[in-house]
């Protein structure tokens, strides 16, 4: 047994959206220890620039590397769309998985007329459309930005009538295209399942990339010989914002109130000259 097998899997998101991935890890890989980080001080990511997202992710990965994680799951579609390739290039010895490709692979197995709801940044990147059509060029894809969803979820307003009204408006153009599949293009959106399911025809199949990325993570761990053979440690939770707010909001999805550490991410990056103004590298 290698020491690295006992190391935790790092999971991060801007907030509680990544808890959908965490729950899948508990279900599919219950033997693994996990370090969960929510960048709540800087959410939502979906309206940020590419340069900002890369900077944030580099800071998070630097911190996680210091915690000796054996793998990182970017449980955030926006960072997966805008920063995955760049941070994989910077952390070559650390397996880093994004949610978009696993989600796209599942989507093409479900249907041919695929709607994607996501943050504005993910929609603008065309990441899902490109990934889906690389796998199946005959698939038709429509992407809809949903800027109000993450703030509403983080404010615990899922069952607010206003949230239903907003969801109906976002889904209308997709329903007009007679989609047969809907992808949650943001890990937060799984929390809206009760609302979205009521607004969609029963024939529309839902794709949750959280389940898909954990299946991909299991295959990667197996391939690298990094599966944990021992009893896992309790999950460590950390946030950049208010720990109490995160703990209260998380309880309804985790079934318990986590102990949450507040961390201050140091700016350990230097400008390298990248698209939209900057590229950064840990220093």
From Swiss-Prot:
Residues binding substrate, per UniProt: 13-14, 45-46, 77-78, 187-188
Region forming the signal peptide: none
Record's keyword annotation contains Hydrolase: no
SUPFAM superfamilies documented for this protein: Aspartate/glutamate racemase
Active site positions, chain numbering: 76 (proton donor/acceptor), 186 (proton donor/acceptor)
Reactions it catalyzes: L-glutamate = D-glutamate
Disulfide bonds: none
Entries under InterPro entries matching the protein: Asp/Glu/hydantoin_racemase, Asp/Glu_race, Asp/Glu_racemase_AS_1, Asp/Glu_racemase_AS_2, Glu_race
Gene3D superfamilies: 3.40.50.1860
UniProt function note: Provides the (R)-glutamate required for cell wall biosynthesis.
Protein family: Belongs to the aspartate/glutamate racemases family.
Protein name (record): Glutamate racemase
Lineage start: Bacteria, Bacillati, Cyanobacteriota, Cyanophyceae, Oscillatoriophycideae
């Amino acid at each position: 047994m290698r020491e690295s097998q006992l190391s935790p899997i790092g999971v991060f998101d801007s907030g509680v959206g990544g808890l959908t991935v965490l729950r899948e890890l508990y279900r599919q890989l219950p033997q693994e220890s996990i370090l969960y980080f929510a960048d709540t001080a800087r959410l939502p990511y979906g309206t940020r620039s590419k340069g900002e997202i890369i900077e944030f992710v580099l800071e998070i990965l630097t911190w996680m590397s210091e915690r000796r994680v054996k793998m990182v799951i970017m449980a955030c579609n926006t960072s997966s769309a805008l920063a995955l390739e760049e941070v994989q290039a910077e952390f070559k010895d650390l397996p880093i998985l994004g949610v978009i490709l696993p989600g796209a692979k599942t989507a093409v197995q479900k249907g041919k007329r695929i709607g994607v709801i996501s943050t504005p940044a993910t929609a603008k990147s065309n990441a899902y459309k490109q990934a889906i059509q690389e796998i199946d060029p005959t698939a038709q894809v429509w992407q809809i930005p949903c800027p109000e969803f993450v703030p509403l979820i983080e404010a615990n307003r899922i069952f607010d009538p206003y949230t239903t009204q907003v969801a109906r408006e976002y889904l209308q153009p997709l329903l007009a295209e007679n989609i047969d599949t809907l992808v949650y293009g943001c890990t937060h959106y799984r929390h809206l399942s009760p609302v979205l399911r009521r607004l969609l025809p029963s024939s529309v199949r839902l794709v949750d990339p959280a389940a898909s990325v954990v299946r991909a993570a299991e295959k990667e761990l197996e391939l690298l010989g990094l599966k944990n053979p021992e009893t896992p440690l309790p999950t460590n939770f950390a946030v950049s914002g208010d720990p109490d707010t995160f703990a209260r909001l998380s309880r309804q999805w985790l079934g318990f109130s986590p102990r949450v550490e507040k961390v201050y991410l140091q700016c350990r990056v230097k400008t390298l000259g990248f698209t939209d103004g900057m590229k950064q590298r840990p220093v």
